[in-house]
From Swiss-Prot:
Pfam family, any one: Med12
Lineage summary: Eukaryota, Fungi, Dikarya, Ascomycota, Saccharomycotina
Gene Ontology terms for molecular function: transcription coregulator activity
Main location: nucleus
Function: Component of the SRB8-11 complex. The SRB8-11 complex is a regulatory module of the Mediator complex which is itself involved in regulation of basal and activated RNA polymerase II-dependent transcription. The SRB8-11 complex may be involved in the transcriptional repression of a subset of genes regulated by Mediator. It may inhibit the association of the Mediator complex with RNA polymerase II to form the holoenzyme complex.
Region spans: Disordered: 31-51
Subcellular location: Nucleus
The protein, known as: Mediator of RNA polymerase II transcription subunit 12
Domain of life: Eukaryota
């Protein structure tokens, strides 16, 4: 090395490189503010910020040299990578906060820090503040001082030196309102004046005398304030329509309420030494529930809206009170109710705003039955709230469950539908908010249900499905139709002919393609599984009855190949059947087919009947029916074009054929085709009767107003003076069903002169004077009706008198004396057919003149008249058979009570055992009346049989119900077998009949005999009932639960619990108690039995929730407590045991059922259980299992909230010290200094003015130590591991906080605001003023709390993060 080499200078290359490296190293570590870290204030430098846990590197030669030597001697290793070393600790802590133990430790640290802050910031020195004195001023200076007080620019410190004398009480309030002084400055002025007044009173005389003077002054002040309030309220109400006056009144109210200088001590009675202010007493005129007080309450609620929303329990009370007042206003029938519409609108606006901010506040199961309708009328999106409330409601359970069950709601809407149905039917079904699949499946099942018998159901259902198919995916509706067809597993579930007709109608409307069903049936594999043979046979029948005219030819071949395994379809020859049918039709209807060679006497009823039976209707498939009906209608159209008009007999035969073919569309089209061509009055009248008979079905197909108009125009063309009863009934019925058609019908009738009714024969009836001349008319009736060889001809002749009232009376007189016989039945049949009398008069006559117990076959005769098929027995022609059927339908529709009385009487006669045919006779009517008049069915048939101890009537009723339900109960089987059979066959469509059958099983178990027994012939309808013994009832309940434990019942529908809702109350109570006890005492808790029947028990408990007879809170206290503990342990244990969710749901259901007893009982054990339940439910809410189950968590949260709400409304616990009477009797003062409670003793002027940050720390309010506390509501305290804590209400995100964790003292005195419409309305002013004082104290406390250190701010940020 050359030692003489020059050292690097400023211009050398080496020097420049060294300098550049130094510059680069310094630039590499330039301090820049990080982007994602919030800076903290540097206390050492004003305006600078520092960042936690970040120190920039500063070059130090000594440190570098020492580190280099250390690395050379010991080696170098890369330091461990710490991803958060230059960032906030938030990311590293966030993952740890999910561990429950870490959260507990963090909470302890924060709580400790908060206690330290409270101890550090507590002011211990006495206050030095003194109220400013008052001086005497002239009127001019006093006025100037008040103007300065109204000017916000003038400081209060300047004004405090010259507070004028002479302004107090009413003058003070009037001046504050007149000068429009700001509320805060008006409060300062009032407090200064009041403090000087009280200080002057205390200096006078003895201490006790001073207290009396103070009470007198408070009395005077209170009366003054209340007087101003009353005058302002009256002015506000009177000036409601004037904007300027209304604004002034509102300002006056605001000033009065903010001033709020009313004393709590003035709520005592005047006799006790203190006065009561006018308007705050117990008089009805001062309650806020009256309409006059509501505007004031609305003003208060709006003023303190945000603080109210911060407390969920207060929001809930406010929601209840708002809805209660709205329901009162809507129900109250005031003469000046329109004047209250602004108030109703304001309350409705508050309800909507509260729902948007706190939807959980409207979960009020105890009030939902009374207030739910009001809430749903106001809030549009109320479905979820309704569901949440109904899940917890335990009163009026049957009604609640019906509204909750979407399928039942849809069925009730469909049952009430009548054609022509209006456009609102579809909207009503959509408004149920059921899912799309449920709506379609329910409509289709209703259309083909065996429990419904009306013809129009198929057309109504297809019309609704057509509407549903609009605006949805093209495959959505057909897929649901295919799914429904595949779900039909038995012929007993549906009316198979209606099912075929429904499929045909859906194909006509181009909604359904049969090939889709064929492909789905093949892919399902049902036809190839031997154990599903019954299901496969049903599907093959549906397949063989598809309308092949709507099926492609390739699919037709496939269908015929698939059904060939069934013998009926394997040998089916459609061409041969069509040829036989065509020949029979040519004989029956020669005019339609222009058969000149065959001349048949159509007047012969026997020939007509014989020929009609030659048509093999029973052998037809649905496709054959369609072909035959279309060929027949085509032939009729061709015949009408040739000028053919059928006679009455021919059209009656034509109608009968189409009715047997179920071709209702073609029948309606045929009537529309023939009416304009009709020139015969008899035919026109018959067509009118046919239209009236099938009105409901035709109204779904045709334009009924147009058809009725055609009838009337055709009638006018006949130029008849009198109107036939058939046409007149059609006109009257059309006017009722089509109100828009009524004016036109009246016009048509007026233009045709005054209409008069005429008999069938068109012969003018005799006058009254002519009829009264024949005094031997009863004897003539005997000769004509009883001794005549041809009763039909005699009745035709007597038809001339059918409009004569004298003849009707004579006929009833003659019938009253006749004995029951077959000849009398034949006579009555023809009298009804030819309208000589009506079924209503005959039935009413027999019920009046015969005792219900000794009619000697009268009921059987009448039932034969109104129900039995007598066509073959009396050789009725087609027109006669139709007339009789038409009269029966009118009687059943218009007089169901008489019909039911006849059926009830027949149940009490022993002939029912030898005459099973009557079951088929009354089947259709009983199903109709059970659907549309269930209460009447129970009143006239069920109750007279179940209540008395009559085995004959009970057995008859059971036969009837078995026939209607297609069951076989009570024929030598046990109660267990009967119950299992009934429970498995119940559906939403036969629920009422199944409920009646279950009542009968329990009421007459063991007393129903298949053999006839002697019956009581006493005139009374009822017999003294005998109440079953308790042992028998318990045995029956045990049998029921053994049946429920059967593994085959686990897949029962969710509505099967409704089956038990009509049982007697005592029996329902025993079933409910057994269900609860079975669950709570199960060895496999929370499971019950090997197959876990908890889901069945939940359904059973839900349906019987309003039938409590045994308080399990007292009888099963230990089981409830231990069961809840086991549920809590299972919810935090991994893995979770099976059936835990069902167990929690069942426990919640039991808790809600016994809510009143659990929350209001003063028993020591129940009180301990209550605390344990509230705490246990909170623990379940915090458990990981519930957190992963949203639906269960929502139900648990609603239940816990409902229990807490009920807990806040019950009486105080016995161990709490009684507080003084008045609005603060349920408030306690919790001191954070000594951790103790005391009574609230806040005085009116304990706080004189707002704290001023520029004043000294001790220049604060008087008695400041009092506000080192929190005002709490008196509620029970939960104990856990020796630590005292309180459960604070929350919404769905409810939380549990320990005392002292909240840095701000927000008073629960806000509860006085929602109570302003509650039971404490007499003293709502005191609540409000007390709230103001406490809020002032809270602000002072928050001012002192601002001295917190940066460490405490960090702790608060960690708390927010948690």
């Amino acid at each position: 090395m050359n030692s003489s080499a020059p050292s690097p200078g400023p211009s050398s290359r080496l020097y420049r490189s060294i300098n550049s490296r130094d510059d680069l190293s310094q630039q590499r570590y330039v301090l820049r503010p990080p982007d994602d870290i919030h800076p903290l204030v540097d206390p050492a430098r004003i305006g600078d910020s520092v960042y936690p846990d970040f120190y920039p590197w500063k070059r130090s030669t000594d440190e570098e040299d020492a580190r280099m030597v250390d690395n050379l001697q010991k080696g170098y290793a890369e330091p461990p990578s710490v991803p958060h070393e230059s960032q906030s600790a938030k990311k590293s802590i966030a993952s740890l906060l999910r561990i429950k133990s870490n959260m507990t430790a963090l909470s302890c640290f924060i709580i400790t820090a908060m206690h330290i802050r409270v101890d550090t910031c507590r002011i211990t020195t006495p206050g030095t503040f003194k109220p400013p004195p008052r001086v005497t001023l002239t009127d001019h200076k006093r006025e100037a001082w008040l103007k300065d007080l109204a000017n916000p620019a003038v400081p209060l410190r300047k004004l405090s030196r010259t507070i004028p004398h002479g302004i107090r009480n009413k003058v003070l309030l009037d001046q504050c309102c007149a000068k429009r002084i700001a509320p805060s400055r008006a409060v300062w002025f009032a407090r200064c004046v009041g403090a000087n007044e009280l200080r002057g009173l205390k200096r006078k005389g003895h201490h006790q005398m001073g207290n009396m003077s103070e009470a007198i002054w408070l009395q005077e002040w209170t009366e003054c304030v209340v007087d101003v309030l009353q005058r302002s309220s009256v002015a506000f109400l009177r000036a409601e329509g004037e904007p300027q006056a209304r604004q002034t009144a509102k300002q006056n109210f605001a000033y009065m309420w903010v001033v709020g200088l009313l004393s709590d001590d003035n709520t005592k009675d005047t006799k006790a030494g203190s006065g009561v202010a006018p308007g705050t007493g117990a008089s009805t005129t001062s309650k806020l529930s009256s309409v006059e007080k509501l505007p004031v309450a609305i003003l208060i609620i709006r003023t303190f809206w945000k603080p109210l929303l911060t407390f969920p329990n207060l929001a809930k009370k406010l929601a209840q009170n708002l809805l209660a007042e709205l329901s009162k206003l809507e129900a109250d029938a005031h003469s000046d109710k329109p004047f209250y519409q602004p108030t109703i609108k304001a309350l409705s606006t508050l309800v909507n705003a509260l729902f948007d901010a706190q939807p959980d506040a409207f979960v009020m199961p105890s009030k939902w039955v009374q207030l739910g309708s009001t809430f749903e009328a106001i809030v549009s999106d109320s479905e979820s709230t309704r569901v949440r409330n109904e899940a917890l409601v335990i009163s009026d359970t049957p009604k609640t469950r019906r509204t909750r069950n979407k399928q039942a709601v849809i069925i009730s809407i469909l049952d009430a539908a009548r054609a022509p149905f209006d456009k609102t039917l579809f909207n009503q079904i959509v408004d149920t908010r059921a899912d799309f699949g449920t709506i379609i499946q329910t409509i289709l099942a209703w259309a083909v249900s065996d429990s419904r018998v009306s013809v129009e159901r198929v057309f109504i259902a297809s019309h609704l499905v057509s509407q549903l198919s609009e605006g949805v995916d093209g495959d959505a509706v057909p897929s649901h139709i295919v799914q429904f067809l595949l779900s039909v597993k038995s012929h007993l579930d549906v009316r198979i002919d209606d099912l075929y007709a429904l499929v045909t109608e859906l194909c006509v409307l181009d909604i359904f393609q049969p090939q889709d069903y064929v492909r789905s049936l093949i892919s399902s594999g049902v036809l190839y599984i031997s154990r599903l043979s019954e299901w496969a046979n049903v599907q093959l029948d549906i397949l063989g009855n598809l309308p092949l005219v709507a099926v492609p030819s390739s699919c037709q071949v496939q269908v015929r190949y698939m059904v060939r395994k069934v013998a009926k379809y394997a040998s089916y020859n459609e061409n041969e059947l069509l040829e036989r049918t065509n020949n029979a039709l040519r004989v029956l209807l020669p005019g339609v087919f222009d058969s000149q060679a065959e001349d048949v006497d159509m007047s012969s009823s026997s020939s007509s009947l014989s020929d009609s039976t030659n048509i093999p209707y029973s052998e037809f498939t649905q496709n054959t029916r369609i072909v035959v009906a279309e060929n027949l209608y085509t032939s009729l159209c061709a015949a009408v074009e040739r000028g053919y008009v059928p006679t009455t007999q021919e059209f009656a035969q034509y109608q009968l054929i189409l009715e047997n073919l179920h071709a209702w569309r073609l029948m309606c089209a045929s009537i529309q085709l023939i009416v304009p061509k009709c020139t015969q009055s008899h035919l026109l009248y018959f067509l009118a009767s046919a239209t009236r008979y099938q009105w409901q079905a035709f109204a779904c197909i045709a334009d009924m107003p147009a058809l009725v108009k055609v009838f009337m125009h055709q009638y006018r063309g006949l130029r008849k003076v009198r109107v036939s009863r058939e046409l007149w009934d059609l006109v009257q019925f059309s006017a009722q069903q089509l109100p828009e058609l009524k004016p036109e019908l009246e016009t048509l009738l007026k233009n045709s002169s005054s209409p008069q009714l005429s008999p069938i024969s068109e012969v003018t009836p005799q006058t009254d004077s002519e009829a009264t001349k024949d005094v031997n008319l009863p004897q003539a009736l005997n000769d004509l009706l009883l001794h005549s060889s041809d009763v039909r001809t005699s009745c035709k002749m007597l038809a001339n008198y059918k409009d004569d009232s004298q003849f009707s009376n004579q006929l009833m007189t003659w019938l009253r004396d006749q004995e029951v016989s077959l000849q009398l039945l034949q006579t009555l049949v023809f009298l009804v057919v030819y309208e000589c009398t009506c079924i209503e008069k005959v039935g009413d006559l027999f019920l009046q003149i015969h005792n219900l117990r000794d009619m000697s076959g009268g009921s059987r005769l009448l039932l034969s008249l109104i129900a039995r098929d007598l066509t073959q027995e009396y050789s009725l022609s087609t027109t006669e058979a139709f007339s009789l059927q038409f009269q029966r339908k009118l009687f059943a529709d218009q007089h169901p009570r008489i019909y039911l009385r006849l059926v009830a009487q027949y149940l009490f006669e022993r002939e029912v055992f030898q005459d099973p045919q009557w079951l088929d006779d009354v089947d259709t009517f009983c199903k109709e009346v059970a659907v549309h008049h269930p209460a009447l069915f129970s009143q006239l048939i069920v109750d007279p049989v179940i209540e008395p101890d009559n085995a004959v009537a009970a057995s008859s009723l059971q036969q009837l119900l078995n026939h209607l339900l297609k069951l076989d109960l009570g024929t030598g089987t046990s109660l267990a077998d009967d119950l299992q059979q009934l429970i498995t066959h119940v559906t939403p469509f036969n629920m009422f009949l199944a409920q009646t059958q279950l009542r009968l099983l329990f009421a007459h178990r063991g007393r129903i005999s298949k053999d006839p027994v002697a019956m009581d012939t006493s005139p009374e309808l009822t017999i003294n009932s005998t109440t079953p013994s308790t042992d028998t009832t318990d045995e029956d309940v045990s049998v029921l639960f053994r049946v429920l434990s059967d593994p085959g019942l686990l897949k029962l529908p969710p509505f099967f619990g409704d089956l038990f809702s009509e049982l007697p109350g005592e029996l329902k109570g025993r079933i409910l108690a057994r269900a609860e006890t079975t669950f709570l005492t199960s060895p496999n808790f929370p499971r019950v039995g090997e197959d876990n029947i908890v889901s069945l028990l939940i359904e059973l408990a839900d349906s019987l929730a309003d039938s409590v007879t045994e308080d399990v809170c007292k009888t099963q206290t230990f089981a409830l407590s231990s069961g809840l503990q086991r549920l809590v342990e299972a919810s935090v244990r991994e893995p979770h045991p099976p059936g835990l969710a069902e167990g929690i749901s069942m426990f919640l259901k039991i808790a809600m059922i016994h809510e009143k007893s659990l929350m209001a009982s003063e028993d020591a054990e129940v009180t301990m259980l209550r605390n344990h339940v509230v705490e246990g439910l909170q623990a379940l809410l915090d458990s990981p299992f519930v957190a992963t189950t949203p639906d269960l968590k929502a139900t648990l949260q609603d239940t816990w909230t409902a229990l807490k709400s009920e807990l806040s409304e019950v009486a105080e616990p016995a161990n709490s010290a009684p507080s003084k009477a008045g609005p603060t009797r349920d408030l306690l003062l919790y001191s954070t200094a000594n951790d103790a409670f005391s009574e609230v003793t806040v005085r009116s002027f304990d706080l004189l003015e707002e704290s001023n940050p520029t004043m000294g720390v001790n220049d604060a309010a008087l008695n400041l130590a009092l506000f080192n506390a929190t005002i709490e509501k008196r509620i029970p305290i939960a104990w856990n591991n020796g630590h005292k804590r309180q459960l604070v209400d929350g919404g769905r995100g409810g939380r549990k906080t320990a005392r002292g964790t909240d840095s701000s003292l927000v008073p629960t005195i806000l509860e006085g605001i929602p109570r302003c419409m509650d039971e404490y309305s007499n003293h709502w002013e005191l609540f409000f003023c007390f709230y103001l004082y406490t809020m002032r104290a809270s602000e002072v406390h928050d001012l002192r709390a601002n001295r917190a250190s940066s460490f405490e701010r960090r702790a608060s940020s960690v708390e927010l993060l948690a």
